[in-house]
Amino acid sequence: MSDSKMDKLARMAPLPRTPLLTIWLAINMALIAQETGHKRIHTVQAATGGGSMLGDVNISAILDSFSVSYDKRVRPNYGGPPVEVGVTMYVLSISSLSEVKMDFTLDFYFRQFWTDPRLAYRKRPGVETLSVGSEFIKNIWVPDTFFVNEKQSYFHIATTSNEFIRVHHSGSITRSIRLTITASCPMNLQYFPMDRQLCHIEIESFGYTMRDIRYKWNEGPNSVGVSSEVSLPQFKVLGHRQRAMEISLTTGNYSRLACEIQFVRSMGYYLIQIYIPSGLIVVISWVSFWLNRNATPARVALGVTTVLTMTTLMSSTNAALPKISYVKSIDVYLGTCFVMVFASLLEYATVGYMAKRIQMRKQRFMAIQKIAEQKKQQLDGANQQQANPNPNANVGGPGGVGVGPGGPGGPGGGVNVGVGMGMGPEHGHGHGHHAHSHGHPHAPKQTVSNRPIGFSNIQQNVGTRGCSIVGPLFQEVRFKVHDPKAHSKGGTLENTVNGGRGGPQSHGPGPGQGGGPPGGGGGGGGGGGPPEGGGDPEAAVPAHLLHPGKVKKDINKLLGITPSDIDKYSRIVFPVCFVCFNLMYWIIYLHVSDVVADDLVLLGEE
């Protein structure tokens, strides 16, 4: 009955007079409405063909049939051959690689493939593979895969869980999930910062041994992929490789897969921040070689500043690295730079020390020269007195020479020599008179030789002729500091000034210096020959003291070099050594660090 007929019936029917009639009309109208609704439903189904509803019902039935007699606690083929789980990975990004923490973080797609015969279904047209949501994973068995060297992992859930399941009609399962994992990466920093690191991710079953699960790379050598957009601030991805291995533990043997990624460090940062500044600091330390050695504040300040700067640079570099016990390549470079800078500071210390020693030697030689000149003047005065001998053999007065009558054995005989050094006449006359009063009455008369008298002459005559020397010649000048040239001969400054071998107090006769015959020459020794040391006035004083101009060059040198020579040599030696070190350093370390892992799939060759 149509709607128009119902409207006509309602208009034609009189108003109900009893409740029974009202109920009857309500029932009829309800039946008419139900019939009309069924007609509308059949009309919609006829328009759409009715296939989608049938498909929905079939897929739901397939999914519902999986739960019938399915136990997700039991692996497929339990008691039979192990389940083969294929694995593929595709690295989306690598966010960090830390030397301090020894780990790296990467974001990747992780896919697993296995077969579960219990999930097989009859193939229908258009229904070869079922793509279902992540909730379905709770209803089936999945491998208990974990990452062996994982430190921290993150599962992405925005906007929904980043995971899907695909069930093939043959029972093969594909599970894909997106993960971000921080995994440990032990590093060898021996060649840092020219090192290459090989980091890996290890995949293994947590509970199933090889009798239950075996892992394999599902697509062979192409099972691991790395996006070409992967980049890091300090590293470049050189390539990757994959391995399959068996691990023996106390609980059994386990199948394990390893994906290894090799990184090569970029040198730009370390060249700009460490290598170039440290090299320039070494070059700056060489500036002190061109400064005047008397500019102590400038050279010391420059040396100390460069040393402290290198120390700060080394400390800041090692602060950003782990506390390792072996030597890194950057430690070799920085250590050498520090030694070069420190050596330049020690070079100035050496120059200053040598200059001080040479200055002290000059002052000492000037004092010796002054004393030698005074001695020479004394000898010249004595020789002049010898040129005009006194018949009485007694020369008094300042600078006079008195010869007493005493013989060689006389107790008081001798020659009184008074060389004027500001002494009064009473000294010369007094000593001469003393010699006469104590001389032997029958001693032969002594004469003084016309030959010039030196220190050696006087010393040899002492005791030979029974002479004694008094006066200013015995006013000795003694120094505790050893003269370098006399030191090698065992002499002191005192010996140098007083004639070398013999001192003024060597009164006893030596070998061959026996008493001469009476009346002999005043300077004669045994046999009347010339005494040791000669009669030259300059023989009493070494030539290098009487003629300082001849040894001026030696005075300005210490160990054969001068302080200026050290600066000149340093200007050449230091740069040459540093350049040679740099050549050897870069050639050796760049060669030994250029190591590529075997069977590595380079990033551009995928």
UniProtKB/Swiss-Prot annotation:
This is Gamma-aminobutyric acid receptor subunit beta. It comes from Drosophila simulans. The gene is Rdl. One of its GO terms (cellular component) is chloride channel complex. Residues 376-451, 482-542 are annotated as: Disordered. SUPFAM superfamilies: Neurotransmitter-gated ion-channel transmembrane pore, Nicotinic receptor ligand binding domain-like. Residues 357-568 are cytoplasmic. Residues 381-395 have a biased composition (Low complexity). Residues 396-425, 499-536 have a biased composition (Gly residues). Residues 1-44 form the signal peptide.
